[in-house]
Amino acid sequence: MPASSGQQASAIEAKGFPNLPRVHWTERYFRLVWGAVGIVGCLLLWQLGSSTGVFDPLFVSSPLEVLRTAVLLLPSPEFLGHLFITSQCLFLGLSIALVVGVLVGLPIGWFPRLNATFEPVIAAVYGVPYIAFLPVIIMWTGIGMTSRVIIVFWSALFPLIINSIQGARGVDDNFLRVGRSFSATNFQMFLTITLPSSVPYILAGLRTSIGRAIVGVVVAEFFMSSKGLGYFINLKANALEMAPAFVAIVLLALFGIALVSLVTYIENRFCNW
């Protein structure tokens, strides 16, 4: 199946990963330190822009103001309720997308006829912005938890399908020949060779899906909810209460960092064969 440039980028990233040596603790420390330097640098520039008047305080709160607001908001039961609703939608939708994406993508990549049949369907649907399905989902399921989870699921699904397909197609032929030499059935080779070899591809797709899922949950809560961080951001921004809105935005960013870091840890821990 011909791959788009985005598919190739994810596939190349995953394909090269199994041959990398285990990351040394010194290198991990190096990345951690410079990552922290980058974050602190951005915060300092943000604070400098706020202090010098480059950023209008009516529209952009300073980091110190956001921090002070966070100290007041985080213990609030109302705000914690918004946080819980968003976390619930995000993790439910992302988990379902991971399971469905792998179960759909691996067989399509493994069987050439399925690949040829579903390639144009996947290309067509993936080319449509997932936000375009929002009115349709509202009509089908109404406004509630189910519709929001579906939006998150749909937002995260296709990178996982595409990378699972690439993983199944990228199995080393030498491994398959060894399996056949031991008279392994197609199903046995799928379970013992294709599935483990596809894990780096799947994790690469999961990293992409995390960002898309966060966007999906925020957009869903903008239009389809009276709870959640997306609703909270929309409510506070419309009232020009920017500091609380930025607290919620920072929390969403921390969600993304934490989930991507978890995926990276899993790669470093289990995919160094």
Where do the PLM segments sit?
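Periplasmic/extracellular loop-to-transmembrane helix junction in inner-membrane transport proteins
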Residues: 16-28, 51-96
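Transmembrane-helix boundary motif in ABC transporter permease subunits
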Residues: 92-122
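Short cytoplasmic-facing helical segments at TM-TM junctions of multi-pass membrane proteins
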Residues: 120, 160-163, 167-205, 229, ...
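Generic hydrophobic transmembrane alpha-helix motif, especially the helices
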Residues: 123-159, 166-167
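Transmembrane alpha-helices
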Residues: 150, 154, 186-220, 246-247, ...
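Hydrophobic alpha-helical transmembrane segments of polytopic membrane proteins
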Residues: 230-265
